[in-house]
Structure formats: C-alpha cells, structure tokens
Amino acid sequence: MNPRRKKRLLITSLLAVALSLAVGLVLFALQQNIDLFYTPTEIIEGKKETGIKPEVGQRLRIGGMVVQGSVKRNPESLKVSFDLVDNGGGIVTVFFDGILPDLFREGQGIVAQGNLLNATEINASEVLAKHDEEYMPPEVSEALVGMDNFKANNK
C-alpha cells in the first residue's frame, strides 16, 4: 500500500471513530431527556403493543385519575402521596414533594413526571393538572375513556 492510500485510510478511520463517538454522546444525552408516557395499567402489565414494562429508576410520565380518598399530606412538609388509576384497573402510588397545582383534586385527571421507584410507586418531580374543563392530552384522554368521573373530549 502506498503512503498516500495509508494516509487516506488513517484519516477516514479517524473520522469514522470521531463520528461514532459524537453519535454515541448525542444518544446518551438524549436518553436522559426522553420521557415515555404510561398509564397505571401499562406500568404494572406493560405496554399493550409490546408488553414492555418500564424499568425501576426509569424517567417517565404517568397519566390517570386521582383516586378518591387517596391523597395523603404530611402536615410538617410539602410531601404528598396519592394513587392514580385508569380504566384498566391498575393503581400506582405517586409521591411528590412540592406545591401541587391549584386544579389538583381527587377525581381529577393529572399527569406526573418522575422516576419509577418500584412496580407500583413513582417519585414525581412534577405534577400537572388539566387547565380547564375541556382540554386533556390525547394520551390521557384515551387512557381514561370509560372511567366513572371522566367525560371524553368532543373535538
């Protein structure tokens, strides 16, 4: 192999390694920012299409209805826990340390973002309540159709 070809091969190889490293770093950075949406039943039983369950420690979003009588507040701090349910019957407990939205109440549809502690518990870093009587994210709306307290959107 002549020196010119060796030089081209070396440069091409270095570029391929650098590109692979850059792609790997980008994917690693994005992995930490991707939040997957689950319902309580999907967390317990897995996604319908794939059967894939979230892993303990995984960052995710969960949507459902706050179970009546499940909200427990710590009188000495902002810590609160409550149960979420969907039409599949799965119940997941959410722990949150912070100020809940003004529209948060029992029987209300909410979305919580946080990390999965175990198969039925989530440590939420953020809790979102729907902002008016009509709007609800499509994923939550689909998951809650058939619930007693839920009125589906009329688009």
UniProtKB/Swiss-Prot annotation:
Residues 1-8 are cytoplasmic. The keyword Hydrolase does not apply. Heme binds at H131, Y135. GO terms for molecular function: heme binding; metal ion binding. Residues 30-155 are periplasmic. Pfam families: CcmE. Keywords: Cell inner membrane, Cell membrane, Cytochrome c-type biogenesis, Heme, Iron, Membrane, Metal-binding, Signal-anchor, Transmembrane, Transmembrane helix. GO terms for cellular component: plasma membrane. It is found in: Cell inner membrane. The keyword Cell membrane applies. Its main location: membrane. One of its GO terms (biological process) is cytochrome complex assembly. The chain crosses the membrane at residues 9-29. It is a single-pass type II membrane protein. Heme chaperone required for the biogenesis of c-type cytochromes. Transiently binds heme delivered by CcmC and transfers the heme to apo-cytochromes in a process facilitated by CcmF and CcmH. Belongs to the CcmE/CycJ family. This is Cytochrome c-type biogenesis protein CcmE. It comes from Psychromonas ingrahamii (strain DSM 17664 / CCUG 51855 / 37). The gene is ccmE.
